[in-house]
């Protein structure tokens, strides 16, 4: 399974890359907003420059999301995003207009990521429209007392049944168990916030065991 980081923060991307586990990056407008220091002066050029900076850090797909709602505007924006770097993947929302944009962009050879997917039927439509990636949001489903990982399992099974080529990105990851379940189910990718990446390596028995080892190591004299 591939690991993407779900952030627009360059420092977090660098830190994840240093672990040797980073295969790509996903961003969205909310993540971009978090890194903007002065919203009154953040232009589209600044946004494109920031995506380019991310692409320079990572040798893998970098998802950048359109901010339009109608098909024509999504296509225009998607083409501009794709021109930033060969690694850019254009994220489009799973709406009727978004599906039309995905179809158009995919036929033009532009990689696409169908985002805000919350049902198997949406995932089927994304695959049939030619999406390169499909992003089910597991945490947001868990938030409304629905089993987000069950959705991932359904999508993986359906895609396997019919040989759909879209890669499944488990998104809206809230804790390490989401990552483990994604791997168990057979999802292609988990896109993970840096806070969760940091927790993947942590276990209390590792900490207590290390403490005991260090205490016992005191018998070894210089």
From Swiss-Prot:
The lineage of its organism: Bacteria, Pseudomonadati, Chlorobiota, Chlorobiia, Chlorobiales. Keywords: Cytoplasm, Pentose shunt, Schiff base, Transferase. GO terms for cellular component: cytoplasm. Pathway: Carbohydrate degradation; pentose phosphate pathway; D-glyceraldehyde 3-phosphate and beta-D-fructose 6-phosphate from D-ribose 5-phosphate and D-xylulose 5-phosphate (non-oxidative stage): step 2/3. Transaldolase is important for the balance of metabolites in the pentose-phosphate pathway. It catalyses: D-sedoheptulose 7-phosphate + D-glyceraldehyde 3-phosphate = D-erythrose 4-phosphate + beta-D-fructose 6-phosphate. One of its GO terms (molecular function) is transaldolase activity. Belongs to the transaldolase family. Type 3B subfamily. This is Probable transaldolase. GO terms for biological process: carbohydrate metabolic process; pentose-phosphate shunt. The active site is at 91 (schiff-base intermediate with substrate). It comes from the Bacteria. The gene is tal. Transmembrane segments: none annotated. Its EC number is 2.2.1.2. It is found in: Cytoplasm. Its main location: cytoplasm.
């Amino acid at each position: 399974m591939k690991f993407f980081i779900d952030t627009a923060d360059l420092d977090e991307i660098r830190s994840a890359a240093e672990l040797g586990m980073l295969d790509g990056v996903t961003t969205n407008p909310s993540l971009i907003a978090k890194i903007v220091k002065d919203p009154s002066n953040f232009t589209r050029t600044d946004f494109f420059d920031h995506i380019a900076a991310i692409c320079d850090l990572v040798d893998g797909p970098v998802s950048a999301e359109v901010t339009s709602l109608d098909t024509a505007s999504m296509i225009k924006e998607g083409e501009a995003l794709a021109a930033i770097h060969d690694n850019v993947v254009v994220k489009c929302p799973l709406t009727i207009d978004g599906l039309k944009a995905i179809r158009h962009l995919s036929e033009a050879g532009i990689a696409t990521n169908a985002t805000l997917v919350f049902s198997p039927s949406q995932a089927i439509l994304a695959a049939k429209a030619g999406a390169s990636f499909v992003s089910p949001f597991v945490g947001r489903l868990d938030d409304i007392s629905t089993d987000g990982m069950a959705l991932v399992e359904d999508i993986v099974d359906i895609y396997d049944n019919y040989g759909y080529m879209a890669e499944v990105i488990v998104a809206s990851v809230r804790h390490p168990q989401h990552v483990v379940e994604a791997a168990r189910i057979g999802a292609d990718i988990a896109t993970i916030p840096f806070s969760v990446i940091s927790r993947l390596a942590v276990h209390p028995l590792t900490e207590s065991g290390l403490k005991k080892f260090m205490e016992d190591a005191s018998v070894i004299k210089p």
